[in-house]
């Protein structure tokens, strides 16, 4: 073998070993692991392979645009913790990511030799215009590859001034997705490279980054509010000189993924919403090369332009190898009527095949070894010939050293033109019981391999010898196919393939294997076959081997279930010219291959599922209930004239999409439950609708009953591996544990619930490795579990489930993933399976390559039921006919011939590359009908490149933009009767087209129908002339043509929904009884083409009434209708049960709809009118009586000019009791415990906190202990009481409305007052607030109006309480009648107490939960106002960080309010409360340290934006840092105070991460007001982030302070100075405890009094004193007053006749008032620890009035509180 193989990128290692007298060189495996592999050894990994076999694969084509280098083995990346929050540049540059460079480095010395630059080639990468960020670009060529060598220089650093490079056309795409795919070599000196990619780059402080330094690969993101980087175990950085294929995708929703050489660099990262929003308009993608000291980054990026590069030559001399020696071999033959095989009796080896006089070799050299668990064994073989076609081999396999003791039976059988290689029996003599524990996993037969035993080969001595194989590629620019001539000499080959064929000019052969092997990720996954070049004598042979099989496997000693085992099997098929083109090649082999291949379950349905879409339910909103989805199916059935449909139900379970994962049988109750789901399944069959569900087998949420500690995946450090965080913080599971512990049972539970009829299961996420091994074998086992229930298998990724899946979401949803992560890009694979899968690259021109008008199309998926907010019905239908009808038409045929054109040059996504387009594809069906698809031009710059001509049996059925295509199948694929056969017509352009009809259509008349959502309309009778018709019709409008007249099927709308046509889809109101002016009620369409009822311009009340059917007697129901009222006229829903009438109404709608999956949200493309939607559901709750025969529902609108819109009426059982503890809508105290919410978050609706989004507020279900306080450090309960609470996840610092009530849900009547109470949990102080508003709260693009809200911030609930807290507020209805209450996200940041990332999310610091909402109408009294105010103010007076003077004034005012008379008037109470509010606003913070405002000047050397003021801002995340160029150690930081100020010491707070600039030795000089200098020094401070103190030992009245770091830590040492904070402490006078001696003495004296009145006075004083003490209200003046008051009390015997009694300075309540009547404020009011918990800035501007009130009210308060005592 050629020594050059070792120098290739693949680093393929070939070893020789003797087999008797022959020496065979074989290649068996790739060096590396799949990115989806986790804890255990998996198929294809290095650990799985025999020591004597090869450990990598060779590249078939060195420069074909793919890097086949084997990935390195990386540690399990997990999901390590991250730290969120504002960061400085330096903190984010820890771990040597962003470090300054020396001003004068020693030298620039890239490792690579100086390149030779071709004169005619220009660089593709350019350095940026900013001079500080410029590097160098040169062109170099090495080993037949051209590169742009990018280098950083001495002027660069690794932070603000790295070398940056850009490439024309490489930007974030129009959908907001960023995709980077590049091949590069690292030419830096070892360990000195700092390279990576900036995505959505604004500047070095605002971006997303993926790259590496000496410690390995990491991600990082930066924004003004949130910045962090990856802190987990890293994948190692590339070795110097290594070739790397880097692929990065950043989706518009913030999901970041990256791999290098097909190894995932980290688990999926989801950017915080704040970061994603901040960067959403940034388009730049740049490469970065950093410098540090004399360390330079030098990388060579492979260019797109490889023209003119001298490639490596094939070996010049012929190769020779050992000759065949069969002298000791005994051969036999087995044969069928057409195929003969020569076989070795000593081993199941085929020497040669003969077919019709032509031959193909098998394994020509002798081979006799099996590899069990990667241990090579020469078995003892017993040969037995069964009959002429079949031979059997009994193998005894022993290896005592490795505990192998087994027998295996292998059968070779010839069947027609096939050779079957089957392991028919395996006996493991070790005791192995599936599902049970085994003491030593070595006793398992984990893997079985016959690598080295080629099943079929081709020789260079044969004419036309070729090998053709397909690997996985999802890059639209790069085909996964290899086409290799087998010659001598030729390049070495050892590589894994999904499909492989060998051929000569006479015969072609294909091989199938059920091996579920992965040699790695990407192109190395799904490698069931291994192709290997072997030199025998003077000929080269390329043989196809089955890759390794998996058999018995286990998880930590638990043997996997029996069903995971699959007996090894492989088949060879040999054929001559199968497509009759007089040429034999791989295509003939591929046609024959279909006779031996596996067929994924349900593949027969694929061709007929033309109308795929997603119906979305999310966040408890039940946007698309099951039975409403049924109406959507009927609507599409009409609009497509009966095409088959596929509906993926995202959110069928729990509270909707991405909630309750792993509990597959938890059918969503709010969307209809099991009963409605089964009805949907059954009724959908009639319309050929195939239903599937979205599930997740990789992560779980705490609400799921399957969430438990054992199943959860952990990181290497023992922390949990967190997954998706939206409604809840998910945690990844260990998929292997799940498999070993009964995953199958969950599918079986679902099957029991639903019965038969469900068509497919779509497995989300699986394939990215977040649950461990998601490779070929693990995926096949998962698919088998699903198939076992009778369900088709579907998956998310284009590369996922290649063996079993029939639908791949990222392939079909063309906007997903970017050009590197689409469908399967392999002509070989598509040739074989085009009719079986929707897995192909579709037509999405901007992706380029295969995506630029694939001839066979490719599914293009759109939606109209809420997925990604897509509710554009017309757009869905247009796309279906423009893209999908012809794609599905082709799938009714199998491909028989594929002709490529000449390569074209394409430029897109920052790449210029060669692509070879298919120019002509032939297809045939079982009846020999022939379809030919031809591209009109091979010129990519011609419009005709994107046009095709399609003929059926020679007759044109598509010509460019127009098609008239026959469709002779019903929705389920059954052939139509002749009179129902039809043709679809569609043209993307207007204009006349002429068509020849088939002979059996050439009658005098045919009938054309326009297709709409009402079915076939506008019938036209067309005359056929000379067998032709001419059509001149609308563009982008579907039509259907029939031989004879047709009618539409009768639709029974809204089956099971108790009303006819809940969504007004029938196009008529004839089912309603209309009173009033019926002409004012009509069906119209929204901007999203959604049908609605509109009532407008009516001069009298208009009502529409319909009977509700199918109701149960004496049963509680809820009914709602969506309403958008643009009029002030009252719009109502009324239910009359015959015994009772229930009505709910709304005036003008005031809340925009922000629910993304709702068809009526306020996105422009879904809006009602005027680009807005105020649709919200309006409910009536009612109870039926004994007679349900005449229950009616009425929609009405009173007279008015403007429009009211209604849509989506839904009636269903509901057991809530919200109205005075009764079910029916009515008066009384409103109570919502969230236990029986009908739908949504009633009585609230979602606010604009996220804009139109899949909102993060939902009904949370209890699963103790995982949803509750304590588990995994959780601080708050997700569920407060009962089984359900309302949870908001992570919506802090938004300054926007989270949710609100609306009048139709609860009406605060004008002038009436209500007490609103609720229990709540909040993870941080004042991040959420209770608000009262009126009218529309405008947010988002309409601006925010928080200043109009009455806002009450809510403290956290866990630092001082073991359970949720209760909040009470008084709300008075505005005269406008549109008052509402809600929860608001303030501008305050959460306090995560040092936790970060998933821990911070899971533990609830950012969350808010509500329960037990109660709204009670009350008669407002002054007492109520005072009690409510006290609850709000008492937490504030408990604070200790305000000055005594300002706090005492507040305390005394609050105490006086607490002592107010019960009969205080409302006006008096409000006046007193206003005064207290002014005092609260006037509180003055204590000064404990110097702040920036205390200084007249702050002078110090500093890096830009990292000045000395940062050390006085109270934020440890910001730094003072000297210049990153170094050289500032020993330079002073000088601080001059405005006024001499007393200080007592310095506390130095180092940076929180990293060590650059940490002070080691310091000198501190403090100059006092007299000019005297006080000098202090410190030496050898340790290098950590703990504070360091210098205690002056005295108080100095300082005027100037000079701090000098004379020695510092960090890279290189003594280069920088830095500080997070410099805290110069001020002397603190300890507050003297209140002197109670006078009071106590007076009390002792007063207690001796005997008069009853005096005793009551004393008791009253004691009670008031106790109340004041308990509630932190006591002041010195109050103590003095209480003592004086007691001292003046005297018994009647000693009282003077006319006593002079001081009028009380402080009000005292009577003793009766104190006994059992004073609220226990300690119980109800929490006392936060810091003032920020009570009085943070809201982020809203304060009015001038408020400022004036604060100053004036101080004077007013004195009149109330301070009274001069008489002598």
Curated annotation (Swiss-Prot):
Query: Which Pfam family is one of this chain's hits?
Result: Gram_pos_anchor
**Additional notes on this entry:** The hydrolysis reaction catalyzed by SpGH101 proceeds with retention of the anomeric configuration.
- Catalytic function, reaction form: a 3-O-[beta-D-galactosyl-(1->3)-N-acetyl-alpha-D-galactosaminyl]-L-threonyl-[protein] + H2O = beta-D-galactosyl-(1->3)-N-acetyl-D-galactosamine + L-threonyl-[protein]; a 3-O-[beta-D-galactosyl-(1->3)-N-acetyl-alpha-D-galactosaminyl]-L-seryl-[protein] + H2O = beta-D-galactosyl-(1->3)-N-acetyl-D-galactosamine + L-seryl-[protein]
Q: Which domain of life is it from?
A: Bacteria
Binding-site list for Ca(2+) 1: 577, 579, 581, 583, 588
Q: Where is the composition biased (Low complexity)?
A: 112-124
What membrane topology does the UniProt entry give? Peptidoglycan-anchor
Question: Which residues, if any, are the signal sequence?
Answer: 1-39
Task: State the UniProt keywords alphabetically.
Answer: Calcium, Cell wall, Glycosidase, Hydrolase, Metal-binding, Peptidoglycan-anchor, Secreted, Signal, Virulence
Give positions of region: Catalytic: 602-893
What species was this sequence derived from? Streptococcus pneumoniae serotype 4 (strain ATCC BAA-334 / TIGR4)
Residues annotated as binding substrate are 658
Name-wise, this protein is Endo-alpha-N-acetylgalactosaminidase
PROSITE patterns named among the record's database cross-references: GRAM_POS_ANCHORING
Q: Which residues carry this modification: Pentaglycyl murein peptidoglycan amidated threonine?
A: 1738
Q: Which InterPro entries match?
A: Endoa_GalNAc (IPR025706), FA58C (IPR000421), Gal_mutarotas_3 (IPR040633), Galactose-bd-like_sf (IPR008979), GH-type_carb-bd (IPR014718), GH101_dom-5 (IPR049314), GH101_dom-6 (IPR040502), GH101_N (IPR040575)
Query: Basic and acidic residues bias located where?
Result: 61-75, 84-111, 304-324, 1717-1730
Family designation:
Belongs to the glycosyl hydrolase 101 family. A subfamily.
């Amino acid at each position: 073998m050629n020594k050059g193989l070792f120098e290739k990128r693949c680093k393929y290692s070939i070893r020789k070993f003797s087999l008797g007298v022959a020496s065979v060189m074989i290649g068996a495996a790739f060096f590396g692991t799949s990115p989806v592999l986790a804890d255990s050894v998996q198929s294809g990994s290095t650990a799985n392979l025999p020591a004597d076999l090869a450990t990598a694969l060779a590249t078939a084509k060195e420069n074909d645009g793919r890097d086949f280098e084997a990935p390195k083995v990386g540690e399990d990346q997990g999901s390590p913790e991250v730290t969120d929050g504002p960061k400085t540049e330096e903190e984010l540059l820890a771990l040597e990511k962003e470090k300054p460079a020396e001003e004068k480095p020693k030298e620039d010395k890239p490792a690579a030799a100086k390149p030779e630059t071709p004169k005619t080639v220009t660089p593709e990468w350019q350095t940026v215009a900013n001079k500080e960020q410029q590097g160098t670009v040169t062109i170099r060529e090495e080993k037949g590859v051209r590169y742009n060598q990018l280098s950083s220089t001495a002027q660069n650093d690794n932070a603000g001034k790295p070398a940056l490079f850009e490439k024309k056309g490489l930007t974030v795409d129009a959908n907001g997705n960023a995709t980077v795919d590049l091949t590069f070599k690292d030419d830096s000196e070892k360990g000195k490279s700092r390279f990576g990619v900036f995505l959505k780059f604004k500047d070095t402080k605002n971006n997303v980054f993926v790259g590496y330094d000496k410690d390995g690969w990491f991600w990082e993101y930066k924004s003004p509010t949130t910045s962090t980087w990856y802190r987990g175990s890293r994948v190692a950085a590339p070795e110097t000189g290594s070739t790397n294929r880097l692929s990065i995708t950043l989706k518009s929703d913030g999901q970041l993924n990256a791999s290098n050489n097909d190894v995932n660099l980290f688990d999926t990262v989801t950017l915080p919403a704040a970061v994603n929003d901040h960067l959403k308009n940034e388009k730049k993608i740049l490469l970065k090369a950093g410098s540090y000291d004399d360390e330079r980054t030098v990388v060579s990026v492979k260019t797109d332009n490889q023209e003119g590069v001298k490639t490596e030559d094939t070996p010049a001399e012929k190769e020779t190898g050992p000759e065949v020696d069969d002298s000791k071999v005994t051969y036999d033959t087995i044969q069928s009527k057409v195929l003969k095989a020569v076989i070795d009796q000593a081993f199941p080896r085929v020497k040669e095949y003969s077919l019709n006089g032509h031959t193909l070799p098998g394994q020509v050299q002798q081979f006799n070894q099996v590899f069990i668990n990667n241990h090579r064994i020469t078995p003892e073989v017993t040969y037995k010939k069964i009959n002429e076609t079949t031979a059997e081999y009994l193998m005894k396999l022993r290896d005592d050293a490795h505990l192998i003791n087994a027998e295996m039976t292998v059968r070779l059988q010839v069947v027609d033109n096939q050779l079957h290689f089957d392991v028919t029996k395996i006996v493991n003599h070790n005791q192995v019981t599936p599902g049970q524990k085994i003491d030593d996993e070595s006793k398992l037969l984990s893997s079985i391999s016959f690598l080295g035993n080629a099943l079929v080969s081709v020789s260079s001595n044969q004419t036309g010898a070729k090998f053709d194989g397909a690997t996985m590629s999802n890059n639209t620019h790069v085909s996964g196919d290899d086409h290799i001539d087998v010659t001598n000499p030729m390049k070495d080959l050892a590589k894994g393939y999904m499909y492989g064929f060998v051929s000569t000019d006479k015969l072609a052969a294909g091989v199938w294997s059920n091996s579920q092997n992965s040699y790695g990720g990407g192109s190395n996954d799904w490698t069931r076959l291994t192709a290997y070049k072997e030199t025998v004598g003077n000929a080269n042979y390329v043989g196809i081997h089955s890759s390794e099989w998996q058999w018995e496997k286990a998880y930590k000693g638990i043997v996997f279930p029996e069903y995971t085992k699959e007996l090894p099997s492989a088949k060879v098929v040999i054929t001559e010219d199968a497509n009759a083109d007089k040429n034999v090649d791989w295509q003939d082999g591929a046609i024959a291959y279909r006779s031996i291949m596996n067929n994924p379950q349900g593949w027969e349905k694929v061709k007929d599922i033309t109308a795929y879409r997603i119906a979305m339910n999310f966040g408890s909103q039940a946007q698309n209930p099951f039975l409403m989805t049924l109406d959507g199916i009927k609507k599409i059935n009409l609009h497509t004239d009966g095409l088959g449909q596929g509906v993926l139900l995202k959110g069928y379970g729990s509270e909707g999409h991405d909630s309750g994962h792993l509990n597959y049988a938890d059918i969503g109750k709010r969307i209809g439950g099991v009963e409605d789901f089964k009805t949907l399944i059954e009724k959908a069959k009639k319309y050929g609708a195939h239903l599937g569900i979205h599930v997740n087998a990789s992560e779980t949420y705490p609400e799921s009953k399957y969430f438990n500690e054992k199943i959860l995946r952990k990181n290497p450090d023992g922390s949990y591996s967190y997954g998706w965080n939206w409604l809840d913080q998910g945690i990844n599971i260990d998929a292997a544990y799940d498999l070993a512990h009964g995953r199958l049972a969950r599918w079986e539970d679902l099957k029991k619930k639903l019965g038969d009829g469900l068509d497919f299961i779509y497995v989300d996420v699986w394939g990215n490795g977040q649950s461990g091994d998601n490779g070929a074998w693990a995926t096949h086992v998962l698919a088998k579990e699903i198939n076992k229930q009778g369900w088709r298998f579907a998956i998310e990724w284009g590369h996922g489930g290649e063996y079993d899946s029939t639908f791949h979401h990222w392939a079909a949803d063309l906007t997903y993933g970017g050009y590197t992560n689409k469908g399967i890009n392999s002509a070989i694979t598509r040739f074989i399976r085009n009719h079986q899968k929707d897995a192909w690259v579709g037509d999405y021109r901007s992706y380029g390559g295969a995506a630029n008008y694939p001839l066979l199309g490719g599914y293009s998926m759109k939606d109209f039921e809420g997925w990604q907010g897509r509710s554009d019905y017309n757009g869905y239908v247009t796309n279906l006919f423009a893209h999908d009808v012809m794609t599905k038409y082709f799938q009714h045929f199998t491909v028989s011939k594929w002709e490529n054109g000449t390569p074209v040059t394409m430029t897109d996504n920052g790449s210029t590359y060669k692509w070879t387009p298919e120019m002509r594809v032939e297809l045939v069906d079982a009846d020999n009908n022939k379809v030919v698809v031809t591209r009109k031009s091979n010129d990519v710059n011609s419009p005709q490149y994107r046009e095709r001509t399609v003929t059926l049996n020679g007759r044109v059925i598509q010509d460019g933009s127009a098609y008239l295509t026959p469709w002779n199948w019903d929705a389920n694929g059954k052939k139509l009767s002749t009179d129902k056969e039809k043709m679809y017509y569609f043209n993307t352009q207007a204009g006349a087209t002429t068509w020849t009809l088939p002979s059996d259509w050439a009658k005098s008349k045919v009938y054309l129908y326009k297709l709409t959502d009402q079915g076939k309309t506008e019938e036209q009778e067309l005359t056929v002339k000379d067998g032709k018709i001419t059509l001149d019709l609308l563009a982008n409008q579907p039509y259907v043509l029939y031989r004879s007249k047709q009618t539409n099927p009768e639709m029974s709308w809204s089956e099971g929904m108790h009303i006819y046509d809940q969504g007004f889809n029938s196009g008529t109101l004839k089912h309603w009884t209309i009173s009033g002016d019926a002409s004012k009620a009509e069906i119209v369409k929204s901007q999203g083409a959604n049908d609605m009822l509109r009532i407008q311009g009516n001069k009298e009340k208009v009502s529409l009434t319909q009977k509700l059917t199918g109701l149960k007697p004496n049963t509680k129901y809820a009914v709602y209708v969506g309403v958008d009222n643009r009029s002030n006229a009252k719009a109502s829903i009324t239910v009359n049960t015959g015994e009772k009438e229930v009505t709910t109404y709304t005036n003008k709608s005031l809340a925009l709809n922000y629910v993304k999956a709702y068809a009526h949200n306020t996105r422009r493309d879904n809006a009602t009118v005027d680009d807005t939607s105020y649709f919200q559901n309006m409910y009536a709750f009612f109870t039926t009586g004994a007679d349900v025969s005449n229950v009616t529902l009425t929609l009405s609108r009173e007279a008015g000019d403007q429009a009211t819109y209604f849509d989506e009426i839904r009636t269903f059982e509901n057991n809530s009791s919200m109205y005075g503890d009764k079910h029916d809508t009515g008066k009384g105290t409103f109570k919502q415990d969230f236990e029986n919410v009908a739908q949504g978050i009633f009585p609230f609706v979602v606010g604009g906190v996220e804009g139109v989004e899949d909102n993060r507020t939902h009904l949370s279900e209890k699963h103790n202990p995982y949803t509750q306080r304590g588990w995994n450090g959780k601080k708050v309960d997700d569920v407060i009481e009962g089984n359900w609470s309302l949870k908001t996840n992570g919506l802090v610092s938004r300054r926007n409305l989270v949710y609100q009530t609306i009048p139709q849900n609860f009406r605060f009547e004008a002038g009436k007052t209500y007490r609103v109470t609720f229990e709540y949990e909040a993870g941080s102080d004042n991040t959420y607030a209770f608000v009262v508003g009126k009218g529309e709260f405008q947010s988002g693009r309409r601006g925010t109006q928080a200043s109009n809200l009455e806002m009450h911030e809510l403290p956290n609930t866990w630092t001082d309480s073991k359970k949720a807290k209760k909040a009470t507020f008084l709300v008075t209805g505005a005269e406008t009648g549109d008052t509402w209450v809600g929860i608001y996200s303030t501008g305050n940041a959460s306090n995560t107490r040092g936790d970060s990332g998933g821990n911070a999310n899971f533990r609830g610091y950012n969350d808010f939960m509500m329960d037990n909402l109660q709204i009670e109408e009350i008669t407002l009294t002054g007492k109520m106002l005072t009690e409510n105010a006290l609850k709000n103010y008492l937490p504030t007076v408990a604070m200790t960080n305000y000055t005594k003077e300002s706090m005492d004034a507040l305390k005394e005012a609050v105490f006086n309010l607490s002592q107010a008379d019960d009969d205080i008037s409302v006006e008096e109470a409000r006046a007193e409360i206003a005064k207290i509010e002014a005092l609260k606003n006037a509180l003055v913070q204590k000064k404990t340290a110097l702040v920036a405002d205390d200084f007249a000047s702050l002078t110090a050397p500093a890096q830009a934006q990292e000045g000395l003021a940062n050390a006085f801002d109270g934020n440890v995340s910001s730094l003072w840092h000297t210049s990153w160029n170094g050289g500032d150690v020993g330079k002073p930081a000088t601080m001059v105070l405005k006024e001499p100020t007393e200080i007592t010491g310095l506390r130095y707070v180092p940076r929180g991460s990293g060590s650059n600039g940490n002070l080691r030795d310091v000198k501190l000089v403090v100059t006092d007001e007299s000019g005297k200098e006080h000098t202090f020094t410190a030496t050898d401070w340790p290098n950590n982030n703990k504070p360091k103190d210098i205690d002056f030992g005295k108080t100095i009245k300082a005027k100037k302070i000079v701090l000098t770091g004379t020695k510092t830590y960090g890279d290189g040492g003594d280069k920088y100075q830095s500080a997070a904070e410099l805290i110069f402490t001020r002397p603190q006078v300890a507050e003297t405890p209140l002197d109670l001696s006078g009071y106590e003495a007076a009390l002792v004296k007063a207690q001796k009094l005997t008069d009853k009145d005096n005793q009551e006075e004393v008791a009253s004083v004691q009670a008031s004193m106790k109340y004041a003490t308990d509630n932190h209200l006591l002041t010195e003046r109050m103590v003095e007053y209480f003592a004086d008051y007691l001292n003046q009390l005297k018994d009647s015997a000693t009282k003077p006749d006319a006593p002079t009694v001081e009028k009380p300075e402080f009000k005292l309540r009577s003793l009766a008032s104190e006994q059992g009547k004073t609220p226990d404020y300690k119980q109800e009011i929490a006392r936060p620890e810091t003032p920020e918990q009570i009085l943070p800035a809201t982020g809203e501007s304060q009015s001038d009035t408020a400022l004036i009130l604060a100053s004036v009210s101080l004077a007013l308060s004195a009149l109330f509180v301070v009274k001069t005592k008489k002598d």
